[in-house]
Amino acid sequence: MEHPAYTLSLLTTAGGLMGYYRKGSIPSLVSGLVFGSVYGIAGYLLHMNRDGGLEMALGASTLLLGAGVIRGMPSRFTKPVPVVLTALGGLGSYYYYNKYKEFYP
């Protein structure tokens, strides 16, 4: 269950770094590093069977989904970055919501 969190950690960190190197965007760098760190911590907690990992991954995925939708609406999802953010957030939210329902019926 921790593999999606580690994957999302890598992808969000790489996306933040790419946004910084291509456009010099400090907000992209900060958000990529923050989301990457949160997903990394969630993955670690899930791997160690500690409390809070599932909720942390679900919360980060929901925020990522919201950020993608908010960024995509003005451009009607014609730009690739909001589409990727929305897709990653949606997939993460779907996965971790189903896992949450599985463990806490």
Curated annotation (Swiss-Prot):
Disulfide bonds: none annotated. The chain crosses the membrane at residues 26-46, 53-73, 77-97. Keywords: Membrane, Mitochondrion, Transmembrane, Transmembrane helix. It is found in: Mitochondrion; Membrane. Pfam families: Tmemb_14. InterPro entries: TMEM14, TMEM14_sf. It is a multi-pass membrane protein. GO terms for cellular component: membrane; mitochondrion. Induction: By the DNA-damaging agent methyl methanesulphonate (MMS) (at protein level). Its main location: mitochondrion. Gene3D superfamilies: Transmembrane protein 14-like (1.10.10.1740). Present with 2100 molecules/cell in log phase SD medium. Belongs to the TMEM14 family. PANTHER family: TMEM14 PROTEIN HOMOLOG YJR085C (PTHR12668:SF53), TRANSMEMBRANE PROTEIN 14, 15 (PTHR12668). This is TMEM14 protein homolog YJR085C. It comes from Saccharomyces cerevisiae (strain ATCC 204508 / S288c) (Baker's yeast).
